[in-house]
Amino acid sequence: MKRVKTYIPGLDEILYGGIPERHIVLVSGGPGTGKSILGKQFLYNGLTKGEGGVFIALEEHPVSVRRSFEHFKWDVRKYEREGKFAIIDTFTGGIGNVAQREKYVVKSIDDVKELSENIRAAIKDINATRIVVDSVSTLYLTKPAMARSIVMQLKRVISGLGCTAIFVSQVSVGERGFGGPGVEHAVDGIIRLDLDEVEGVMYRSIIIWKMRDTKISMVRHPMDITDNGIIVQWDKYLKISNWSVSIQPLPENEISQMKKAVEEAEKEVEVKVEGKEEEE
C-alpha cells in the first residue's frame, strides 16, 4: 500500500508508516489542541519534500494563514512564488484590496460548484498532492443540512485527483465527538487531539481513532507543541483519570513494529522519488 508520510515527529510511527494515499483524514479537537498546526505542518513538510500543497481557508483570512505558517518559520511564501503552494480563499468573499490579489477565491461558501472548480484548478496548476481544509466545522454552521454532502463532494474531488487531505474539525471544550453529525463516517481516518487539565496541569495528547486500510496504534500518546511544531511521543502512552496522570513506555514489541513500518514506508518513498527522477 502506498502511504503519504506526514514527516511530523512521532506521527508516522503511530500510523504505522503514514497516511494511506488518497485518504481523507479528519483532525478533530477542542480549542488550543493543535489541530490547525498539525494540518499546516503536514502541508509544509510536504512542500520541503517537493510535494505541492493547497490550503483551503474556510474561516481565516489568507493573510492570517500565511502569518500562522511564519510563526513556526515555515516560509510558504517561497513555495507560493515557485508555484508549489496555493491558498483557496473562501473567507473574504473577494471583498477588500488584499483579497482581490488572491488567485483562487470562492465568493460564497454555499456555492459547492465554485468551490470544487477552484480546488480542481489549484491542484492541477501546482500539481498538488497534499490538501488541508480548515475547518469543515464552518460548513456545519453555515449549511448544516448540506454539510455532510459537501464533505462527500470535497472528498470525491480531492481523492479523485490523487491527493491526500486533512480536514480540520472543531469540537467544544470537554466534548468527545468529532465536530459534526455524520462527518466521521464520510472520512477515511480520524485523528483526535485533546488538552486535559488534571490537578491544575494541562496535558496534550493524540489518538488515532480510526484509519481505513492500515494498522494503527490503539493507545493515547503524549504530544507537545514546540517552536518547530508538533512532536508526538510515539514510544509512550498516556493514562488520564480525574485525579492522576501516568505516562508509560510502550511494550518493546509494539515499538519494534512501528519502527519497521516506518522504515518500509521510507523505502517506498525512496523508490517513488527515484522513479520520478528517471521520468524527468
Curated annotation (Swiss-Prot):
Keywords: ATP-binding, Nucleotide-binding. It comes from Saccharolobus solfataricus (strain ATCC 35092 / DSM 1617 / JCM 11322 / P2). The lineage of its organism: Archaea, Thermoproteota, Thermoprotei, Sulfolobales, Sulfolobaceae. It comes from the Archaea. One of its GO terms (molecular function) is ATP binding. ATP binds at G29, G30, P31, G32, T33, G34, K35, S36. NCBIfam families: thermo_KaiC_1. It holds the Pfam family ATPase. InterPro entries: KaiC-like_dom, KaiC_dom, P-loop_NTPase, UPF0273_KaiC-like. This is UPF0273 protein SSO1861. Residues 2-246 form the KaiC domain. Belongs to the UPF0273 family.
